[in-house]
Amino acid sequence: MSVTYVASCKLPTPFGVFDMHGFQEVGTQKEHIALTLGDIGDGASVLARTHSECLTGDALFSMRCDCGYQLDEALRSIAAEGRGILLYLRQEGRGIGLLNKIRAYNLQDQGADTVEANEQLGFAADMRDYSMCKPMLYHLGISRIRLMTNNPRKVDSLTKLGIEVVERVPLEVGRNPHNRNYLATKAGKLGHLLTTHQDDDYVVAAK
Protein backbone atom coordinates (compact mmCIF):
# COMPACT_ATOMS: atom_id res chain seq x y z
CA MET A 1 0.00 0.00 0.00
CA SER A 2 1.23 3.50 -0.82
CA VAL A 3 0.74 6.41 1.54
CA THR A 4 1.53 10.08 1.11
CA TYR A 5 2.99 12.18 3.90
CA VAL A 6 0.86 15.32 4.37
CA ALA A 7 2.05 17.44 7.30
CA SER A 8 3.31 17.47 10.90
CA CYS A 9 2.59 19.54 13.99
CA LYS A 10 3.12 19.60 17.75
CA LEU A 11 0.46 17.88 19.88
CA PRO A 12 0.51 18.67 23.61
CA THR A 13 -1.06 15.87 25.67
CA PRO A 14 -1.28 15.00 29.38
CA PHE A 15 1.63 12.62 28.72
CA GLY A 16 3.92 15.12 27.00
CA VAL A 17 4.29 17.07 23.78
CA PHE A 18 4.26 14.68 20.83
CA ASP A 19 4.85 15.31 17.15
CA MET A 20 1.80 14.38 15.07
CA HIS A 21 2.40 13.31 11.46
CA GLY A 22 -0.44 12.97 8.96
CA PHE A 23 -0.53 10.42 6.14
CA GLN A 24 -3.08 9.59 3.44
CA GLU A 25 -3.54 6.33 1.55
CA VAL A 26 -3.15 6.62 -2.19
CA GLY A 27 -6.39 5.57 -3.86
CA THR A 28 -8.69 5.29 -0.84
CA GLN A 29 -7.73 8.70 0.62
CA LYS A 30 -8.07 7.16 4.08
CA GLU A 31 -6.18 9.19 6.70
CA HIS A 32 -3.81 7.85 9.38
CA ILE A 33 -1.56 9.55 11.90
CA ALA A 34 1.66 8.83 13.76
CA LEU A 35 2.47 10.29 17.16
CA THR A 36 6.19 10.36 17.89
CA LEU A 37 8.29 11.38 20.86
CA GLY A 38 12.04 11.81 21.13
CA ASP A 39 14.78 10.74 18.74
CA ILE A 40 13.27 7.83 16.82
CA GLY A 41 15.45 7.83 13.72
CA ASP A 42 18.76 6.78 15.27
CA GLY A 43 18.55 3.15 14.11
CA ALA A 44 17.84 1.70 17.55
CA SER A 45 14.62 -0.23 18.13
CA VAL A 46 11.68 2.00 19.02
CA LEU A 47 8.84 1.33 21.47
CA ALA A 48 5.76 1.26 19.25
CA ARG A 49 2.02 0.75 19.24
CA THR A 50 -0.20 0.24 16.18
CA HIS A 51 -3.63 1.29 17.42
CA SER A 52 -6.73 0.86 15.30
CA GLU A 53 -9.36 3.55 15.75
CA CYS A 54 -12.01 2.83 18.39
CA LEU A 55 -14.31 5.83 18.80
CA THR A 56 -16.31 4.18 21.57
CA GLY A 57 -13.27 3.23 23.63
CA ASP A 58 -10.81 6.00 22.74
CA ALA A 59 -13.19 8.98 22.91
CA LEU A 60 -16.38 7.84 24.67
CA PHE A 61 -14.72 5.84 27.51
CA SER A 62 -16.56 2.61 26.69
CA MET A 63 -15.81 -0.28 29.02
CA ARG A 64 -16.99 -2.89 26.48
CA CYS A 65 -13.42 -3.20 25.18
CA ASP A 66 -9.88 -2.44 26.35
CA CYS A 67 -8.97 -0.09 23.49
CA GLY A 68 -9.12 3.25 25.29
CA TYR A 69 -7.15 1.89 28.21
CA GLN A 70 -4.51 0.51 25.85
CA LEU A 71 -4.25 3.86 24.06
CA ASP A 72 -3.67 5.68 27.35
CA GLU A 73 -1.15 3.11 28.58
CA ALA A 74 0.75 3.11 25.29
CA LEU A 75 1.17 6.90 25.40
CA ARG A 76 2.18 6.73 29.07
CA SER A 77 4.76 4.06 28.28
CA ILE A 78 6.21 6.04 25.38
CA ALA A 79 6.41 9.14 27.58
CA ALA A 80 8.10 7.19 30.38
CA GLU A 81 10.68 5.85 27.92
CA GLY A 82 11.24 9.28 26.41
CA ARG A 83 10.95 8.05 22.83
CA GLY A 84 8.54 6.01 20.77
CA ILE A 85 5.77 5.98 18.20
CA LEU A 86 2.05 5.32 18.09
CA LEU A 87 0.44 4.68 14.72
CA TYR A 88 -3.27 5.56 14.89
CA LEU A 89 -4.96 3.68 12.07
CA ARG A 90 -8.42 4.55 10.77
CA GLN A 91 -9.96 1.08 10.74
CA GLU A 92 -12.79 1.21 13.25
CA GLY A 93 -14.31 -1.97 14.61
CA ARG A 94 -11.49 -4.29 13.47
CA GLY A 95 -12.08 -2.93 9.98
CA ILE A 96 -15.89 -3.11 9.66
CA GLY A 97 -16.62 0.56 10.38
CA LEU A 98 -18.48 2.39 13.13
CA LEU A 99 -22.09 1.71 12.11
CA ASN A 100 -21.43 -1.98 11.55
CA LYS A 101 -19.69 -2.01 14.92
CA ILE A 102 -22.91 -0.72 16.49
CA ARG A 103 -24.79 -3.50 14.70
CA ALA A 104 -22.26 -5.99 16.06
CA TYR A 105 -22.69 -4.59 19.58
CA ASN A 106 -26.44 -5.08 19.23
CA LEU A 107 -25.87 -8.74 18.40
CA GLN A 108 -23.54 -9.02 21.38
CA ASP A 109 -26.28 -7.57 23.58
CA GLN A 110 -28.37 -10.54 22.43
CA GLY A 111 -25.70 -13.09 23.37
CA ALA A 112 -23.25 -13.33 20.47
CA ASP A 113 -19.55 -12.93 21.18
CA THR A 114 -17.41 -10.41 19.28
CA VAL A 115 -16.35 -12.95 16.63
CA GLU A 116 -19.84 -14.43 16.15
CA ALA A 117 -21.32 -10.94 15.78
CA ASN A 118 -18.93 -10.07 12.96
CA GLU A 119 -19.62 -13.36 11.21
CA GLN A 120 -23.41 -12.95 11.53
CA LEU A 121 -23.03 -9.62 9.74
CA GLY A 122 -21.06 -11.28 6.94
CA PHE A 123 -17.59 -10.12 7.98
CA ALA A 124 -14.43 -11.94 8.95
CA ALA A 125 -13.47 -11.86 12.63
CA ASP A 126 -10.70 -9.34 11.94
CA MET A 127 -10.56 -7.34 8.71
CA ARG A 128 -7.72 -4.99 9.61
CA ASP A 129 -4.87 -4.29 7.19
CA TYR A 130 -1.46 -3.16 8.43
CA SER A 131 0.20 -2.57 5.06
CA MET A 132 0.19 1.21 5.59
CA CYS A 133 2.47 0.81 8.61
CA LYS A 134 5.70 0.08 6.73
CA PRO A 135 5.74 3.25 4.58
CA MET A 136 4.71 5.35 7.60
CA LEU A 137 7.55 3.91 9.69
CA TYR A 138 9.98 4.19 6.76
CA HIS A 139 9.15 7.86 6.29
CA LEU A 140 9.95 8.49 9.96
CA GLY A 141 13.23 6.60 9.81
CA ILE A 142 12.15 3.58 11.86
CA SER A 143 13.15 0.05 10.86
CA ARG A 144 13.03 -1.87 14.17
CA ILE A 145 10.26 -1.78 16.77
CA ARG A 146 9.35 -3.17 20.18
CA LEU A 147 5.63 -3.65 19.68
CA MET A 148 3.13 -3.08 22.48
CA THR A 149 0.41 -5.67 21.81
CA ASN A 150 -1.21 -8.81 23.16
CA ASN A 151 -1.91 -10.02 19.62
CA PRO A 152 0.72 -12.34 18.09
CA ARG A 153 -1.13 -12.22 14.75
CA LYS A 154 -0.34 -8.51 14.59
CA VAL A 155 3.33 -9.30 15.14
CA ASP A 156 3.17 -11.86 12.33
CA SER A 157 1.39 -9.44 9.98
CA LEU A 158 3.96 -6.69 10.52
CA THR A 159 6.86 -9.14 10.20
CA LYS A 160 5.50 -10.40 6.86
CA LEU A 161 5.42 -6.80 5.66
CA GLY A 162 9.15 -6.51 6.33
CA ILE A 163 8.96 -4.66 9.64
CA GLU A 164 11.46 -6.00 12.18
CA VAL A 165 9.64 -6.63 15.46
CA VAL A 166 12.42 -7.30 17.96
CA GLU A 167 10.15 -7.69 20.99
CA ARG A 168 6.48 -8.05 21.88
CA VAL A 169 5.64 -5.89 24.91
CA PRO A 170 2.42 -7.01 26.68
CA LEU A 171 -0.28 -4.35 27.09
CA GLU A 172 -2.80 -5.79 29.53
CA VAL A 173 -4.93 -2.99 30.99
CA GLY A 174 -8.58 -2.10 31.40
CA ARG A 175 -10.02 -5.45 32.42
CA ASN A 176 -13.48 -5.02 33.98
CA PRO A 177 -16.81 -6.86 34.30
CA HIS A 178 -18.14 -5.27 31.09
CA ASN A 179 -15.36 -6.60 28.86
CA ARG A 180 -14.64 -9.91 30.61
CA ASN A 181 -16.30 -12.01 27.89
CA TYR A 182 -14.83 -9.85 25.12
CA LEU A 183 -11.30 -10.43 26.42
CA ALA A 184 -11.99 -14.15 26.86
CA THR A 185 -13.09 -14.34 23.22
CA LYS A 186 -10.02 -12.44 22.05
CA ALA A 187 -7.87 -14.96 23.89
CA GLY A 188 -9.85 -18.06 22.92
CA LYS A 189 -10.76 -17.29 19.30
CA LEU A 190 -8.34 -14.60 18.15
CA GLY A 191 -5.21 -15.90 19.84
CA HIS A 192 -4.46 -12.93 22.08
CA LEU A 193 -1.98 -13.66 24.86
CA LEU A 194 -3.79 -12.61 28.03
CA THR A 195 -3.16 -13.49 31.65
CA THR A 196 -5.87 -15.29 33.60
CA HIS A 197 -6.95 -12.97 36.41
CA GLN A 198 -8.53 -13.70 39.76
CA ASP A 199 -10.13 -10.24 40.08
CA ASP A 200 -12.97 -10.55 37.56
CA ASP A 201 -15.25 -8.43 39.71
CA TYR A 202 -12.78 -5.56 39.89
CA VAL A 203 -14.29 -2.42 38.37
CA VAL A 204 -11.78 -0.23 36.58
CA ALA A 205 -11.93 3.36 37.80
CA ALA A 206 -13.12 5.96 35.31
CA LYS A 207 -10.29 7.44 33.29
Curated annotation (Swiss-Prot):
Pathway: Cofactor biosynthesis; riboflavin biosynthesis; 5-amino-6-(D-ribitylamino)uracil from GTP: step 1/4. Its EC number is 3.5.4.25. It holds the Pfam family GTP_cyclohydro2. It is an enzyme of class 3 (hydrolase). InterPro entries: GTP_cyclohydro_II, RibA, RibA-like_sf. One of its GO terms (biological process) is riboflavin biosynthetic process. The gene is ribA. Zn(2+) binds at C54, C65, C67. It comes from Hahella chejuensis (strain KCTC 2396). Transmembrane segments: none annotated. This is GTP cyclohydrolase-2. NCBIfam families: PRK00393.1, ribA. The active site is at D126, R128. Keywords: GTP-binding, Hydrolase, Metal-binding, Nucleotide-binding, Riboflavin biosynthesis, Zinc. GTP binds at R49, T50, H51, S52, E53, Q70, E92, G93, R94, T114, T149, K154. GO terms for cellular component: cytosol. Catalyzes the conversion of GTP to 2,5-diamino-6-ribosylamino-4(3H)-pyrimidinone 5'-phosphate (DARP), formate and pyrophosphate. GO terms for molecular function: GTP binding; GTP cyclohydrolase II activity; zinc ion binding.
